[in-house]
């Protein structure tokens, strides 16, 4: 089963050494705002990525939660530990919001 977390729980993973937060949205959306520390890997390019660390929990978020579930499912199949954010970035109202390229 895919582990899901609420958008509020996303703050728990920010800044942790054992987690990698991945923003699956388009580059333009990421540039406008994103969760602090998140790396931008647009969903369309994710399938070809072979360089993601096996020793970290991959925390995926997208716009509303659909793509992140699909990504989490795929990477669990590859042997990773994953989390998918329910409701995606749209639901996130946490304190780790970054606007622009800060």
What do the predicted segments below correspond to?
Residues 1-20, 27-57, 63-102:
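Rhodanese-like catalytic fold shared by cysteine-dependent sulfurtransferases
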């Amino acid at each position: 089963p895919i582990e899901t977390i609420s958008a509020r729980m996303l703050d728990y993973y920010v800044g942790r050494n054992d987690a990698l937060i991945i923003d699956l949205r388009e580059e333009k959306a990421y540039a406008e705002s994103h969760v602090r520390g998140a790396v931008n890997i647009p969903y369309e390019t994710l399938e070809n990525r072979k360089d993601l660390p096996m020793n970290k929990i991959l925390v995926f978020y997208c716009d509303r939660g659909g793509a992140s579930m699909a990504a989490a499912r795929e990477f669990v199949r590859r042997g990773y530990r994953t989390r998918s954010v329910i409701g995606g970035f749209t639901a996130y109202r946490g304190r780790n919001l970054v606007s622009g390229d800060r």
